[in-house]
């Protein structure tokens, strides 16, 4: 009887030990799967951010090369599809355009903060609430006589706009510009109200409709040094050339994101190795 009881007790202990080893192995395997999945995911994200870094670098180099080209006169934009073709062929190239600004059809877009690389943006005392000013221009001289284009003249603080300090030159002007693409409407950005002239984001087609420009028109943006107008308190403030190569997510951010993901992948790999020992 005693032998039978002792044998049963040894059997129970053996089964318990086996169950413990089995449970430990299961937990170890689960940990390896968990950390292995983390390693694979973070490696993928790190590689993706690395590719984005080199892609962003290439875009910046292409823009800088285009901006170094000699300025040229804005080509004719009349005719179906011509405006889109001109915009595509002259992306980020400095252009000149001559004509008369139609201030009666001026539109403000915003609210907006001042453009980067300007004293207004960097000065903490400068008002940050303002608007972009878009004004139609009727071209003068040459084959482009009478054509109309949309000119994004720059940014103005709300207080200066309310006080009537916006500069509205009369007569013929010659502007240094770059072609500007339409913006994508943000998820929480209201719809533009073309009829009332309330614009919250840059939509070339809607702005052209408001200005009565056929064939969609082309939108150009004036460029400057970003400092002189601010010092002289002359509005609107044109975007400087240096800001044309800016992106919301910079190359440095992509590099930082990649380093973070690769660090997490390395930590996950170490944890997986420890679990396998």
At which residue positions do the language-model features occur?
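Surface-exposed, charge/polar-rich loops and edge strands
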Residues: 2-277
């Amino acid at each position: 009887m005693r032998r039978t009881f002792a044998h049963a007790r040894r059997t129970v202990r053996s089964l318990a030990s086996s169950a413990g080893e089995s449970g430990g192995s299961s937990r170890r395997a689960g940990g390896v799967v968990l950390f292995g999945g983390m390693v694979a995911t973070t490696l993928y994200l790190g590689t993706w951010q690395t590719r984005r870094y080199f892609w962003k670098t290439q875009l910046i180099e292409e823009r800088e090369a285009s901006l170094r080209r000699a300025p040229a006169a804005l080509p004719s934009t009349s005719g179906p599809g011509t405006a889109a073709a001109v915009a595509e062929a002259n992306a980020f190239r400095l252009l000149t355009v001559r004509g008369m600004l139609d201030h009666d059809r001026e539109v403000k877009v915003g609210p907006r903060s001042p453009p980067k690389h300007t004293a207004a943006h960097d000065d903490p005392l400068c008002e940050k609430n303002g608007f972009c000013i878009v004004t139609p221009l009727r071209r003068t001289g040459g084959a482009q006589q009478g054509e109309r284009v949309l000119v994004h003249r720059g940014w103005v603080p709300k207080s200066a706009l309310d006080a009537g300090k916006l500069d509205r030159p009369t007569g013929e002007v010659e502007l240094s510009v770059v072609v500007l693409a339409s913006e994508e409407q943000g998820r929480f950005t209201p719809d533009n109200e073309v009829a009332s002239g309330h614009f919250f984001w840059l939509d070339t087609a809607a702005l052209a409709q408001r200005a009565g420009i056929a064939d969609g028109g082309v939108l150009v943006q004036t460029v400057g040094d970003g400092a002189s107008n601010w010092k002289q308190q002359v509005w609107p403030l044109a975007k400087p050339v240096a800001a044309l190569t800016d992106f919301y997510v910079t190359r440095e951010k992509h590099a930082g994101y990649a380093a973070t993901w690769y660090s997490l992948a390395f930590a996950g790999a170490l944890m997986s190795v420890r679990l396998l020992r």
